[in-house]
Design a protein with these regions (language model features):
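A conserved short coil-to-beta-strand element within the FAD-binding core of flavoproteins
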Residues: 35-48
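Conserved N-terminal/central alpha/beta ligand/cofactor-binding core
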Residues: 1-32, 38, 143
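Short hydrophobic core segments
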Residues: 39, 52, 59-76, 86-87, ...
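An anion/pyrophosphate-binding glycine-rich loop and adjacent beta-alpha core
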Residues: 92-95, 104-229
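Flavin (FAD/FMN) cofactor-binding core of flavoprotein oxidoreductases
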Residues: 14-19, 99-107, 252-269
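A conserved FAD-binding loop/helix module that cradles the flavin
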Residues: 69-89, 292-317
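Glycine-rich loop(s) and the adjacent beta-strand/alpha-helix scaffold that form part
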Residues: 63-109
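A glycine-rich dinucleotide-binding beta-alpha-beta segment and adjacent secondary-structure elements
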Residues: 35-37, 213-293
Length: 317
């Protein structure tokens, strides 16, 4: 499968189609002996797992791999059953919660810019309870009908507590390549070129079309005000807005829309070389059922692939 590397060492298929990953996995698995049956419980003999109970009967095996995913996208089958299986073997399960998830925003202007994707902007996540920035990165984000999404927002969401959302503000620097002083100079030059135009018609070289009415509204400058009437103070405030477009987080989107689940089987109870349980012989874990997660960009898939490979090697050890 042809792959490409993007900003931040994120790996994607060249086609940008997730279905190509699925197709590659399906091709690879052809010929394997598979049974399509709903697993309902693990079977034990003392401190050893000996099989799986399913809706179609019991199946016995020397080794059992739990690779059931988390609770994100339950339509794919990841309904959290793996946590139940792990607990039945005596494992500790760290509380599962949504991670890498779009956020709903209080301000209504996001809907006006719906569908707009911004590249090379900087997103900062401010935790007002701690008076500190808990995430800051440059990349891409997307305006949606409910708020914000895209790689930057997904990664930033991993640093927010889902039940205390009112403590977070998102700060978007629309022009991170320019400091405030240079941006003011840029605005001054643009205004000189458009000196007889209305303010709302003077920003086409600086901002995407969908974002212009949003910025005009937030700037406090009347859209039909002539550029030659804009004061130095108004120009400075506009520059400050472009460097710090601030939105208030309302809540996460439903867990069903999360890219990954944070939390899961405590990794201290799993052998990192073989992925075998330290509590139950013959029981192995791989992928998102474990308390391991990472940023978007193929890293979580790599965790799944690598832990599964280690488990497969562990079967024979």
């Amino acid at each position: 499968l042809p792959l490409k590397t993007e900003r931040g060492n994120r790996i994607f298929p060249v086609s940008d189609k997730a279905s190509d990953i699925v197709d590659a996995l399906c091709r690879f698995s052809k010929g394997a002996k598979t049974i399509n049956a709903e697993a309902t419980a693990l079977l034990f003999d003392g401190k050893r797992v000996i099989g799986v109970k399913t809706a179609d009967g019991e199946f016995f095996a020397e080794n059992i791999l739990v690779a059931t995913g988390g609770v994100s996208y339950p339509l794919t089958g990841s309904t959290g059953d793996g946590y139940k299986f792990a607990r039945s073997a005596g494992h500790t399960v760290e509380e599962p919660k949504a991670s890498l998830i779009p956020v709903e925003i209080e301000e209504g202007f996001c809907k006006k810019a719906m569908g707009l994707s911004l590249k090379n902007v900087t997103l900062s996540v401010e935790d007002s309870a701690k008076s500190k920035t808990v995430f800051r990165e440059m990349g891409e984000l997307l305006f949606t009908h409910f708020g914000l999404s895209g790689p930057l927002v997904l990664s930033g969401s991993a640093h927010m507590r889902p039940f205390e959302m009112d403590r977070y503000k998102l700060h978007i620097d629309l022009k991170p390549a320019l400091d405030l002083q240079k941006l003011e100079k840029r605005l001054e030059r643009d205004f000189e070129k458009n000196i007889n135009r209305d303010f709302q018609n003077s920003l086409s070289e600086l901002l995407p079309r969908k974002l212009i009415p949003v910025v005009v509204s937030l700037s406090g400058i009347s859209g039909d005000k002539k550029v030659n009437q804009i004061t130095a103070q108004e120009r400075k405030k506009l520059a400050e807005l472009l460097k710090n477009l601030t939105v208030t987080v309302k809540k996460f989107r439903p867990v069903e829309e999360a890219i990954v689940t944070s939390g899961g089987v405590n990794v201290k109870e799993v052998d990192p070389k073989t992925m075998e349980s330290k509590l139950c012989k013959g029981l192995f874990f791989a992928g998102e059922v474990l308390d391991v997660d990472a940023y978007t960009g193929g890293f979580n898939l790599q965790i799944a692939f690598s832990t599964a490979h280690a488990a497969a090697e562990g079967f024979g050890s």
